[in-house]
Amino acid sequence: AAGWADLDLDDAGALVRCTYEANLQYTGGSTNLCPLSTLPFLHQTTSGAVPTVDQIMDRVVVSHDWMGDVFEQLLRTQATQDILRLFNGVTAIVIGAQVRPSFYYALTGAIYLDADNFWLTAAQRDVINEAPDFRSDFDRDLMYSGVWRYTQNNQNIFLAFPATSRISRDLTYLLAEAGWLLYHELAHASDYMPPAARPTLNSSLSAWGNISPRYEAAQLPSDLMAASFPLQSAPLGGLAQVKFFGATADATQRAYTPNDVAGFFSSDRATDEYN
């Protein structure tokens, strides 16, 4: 069952109801997305100031209590002001044992985080679903793999923690394990609801009701960037459909060598296969 780390909202149950229930619908006669008057963006609470950890924790939903405890410790001891400020772009933070992959959901305005990024002990890890990301086999027919890493002093920041080792992780390590994830998902949130658009939010509408006109009009910052700096490689666009959306690779795509793909990539403007 869903729970929460710490809630001061008038209706604490609304946080779970508005973000965690499987029957949320945004079209037809059964539309039941919560309006911002029920669950506002955090920016509407802070007026754009850097939110306090308590204000952020008021928006946390977890599947197991330890997830909220660890997340709060991470924010209080490791998070910088820029990470805290980015939380203004969400309505809630959901951390769950069944969430994989992590994602931002524009219908609710919330981010949903894989608890595997937050465990400290083997016992905590034991409750987390071990099923792989459903996208992990999408590139099975391709002859190349995209590689990436995050580094500090030119050293990979990630450490290996085999499940059979039963070893614990230190809280300070979670900044490496979860910091990149927070920046990634919170960047999605600020793309769909950028700071400049937040003062004019309509609280009678849901998060998606406020976002959808901008999305449909291609007014998101990512849309403007794509228009100003368009990607050039049609082959890479097709490969992205295979690797990230599950399209079936055709014969041409299956025949691309790593050198072929490197050539497509090096002459284009992207910084990564997946941003």
Task: Go through the PLM ranges and name each one.
Residues V242-N275:
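Pan-zinc metallopeptidase signature
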Residues A1, S190, G209, P213, ...:
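Generic low-polarity alpha-helical segments
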Residues L75-G246:
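Acidic/His-rich structured neighborhood in mature extracellular/periplasmic domains
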Residues A1-F103, A197, N202, N275:
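N-terminal low-structure segments adjacent to metalloprotease catalytic domains
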Residues G48, T52, S168-R169, D260:
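Hydrophobic alpha-helical segments with strong N-terminal bias
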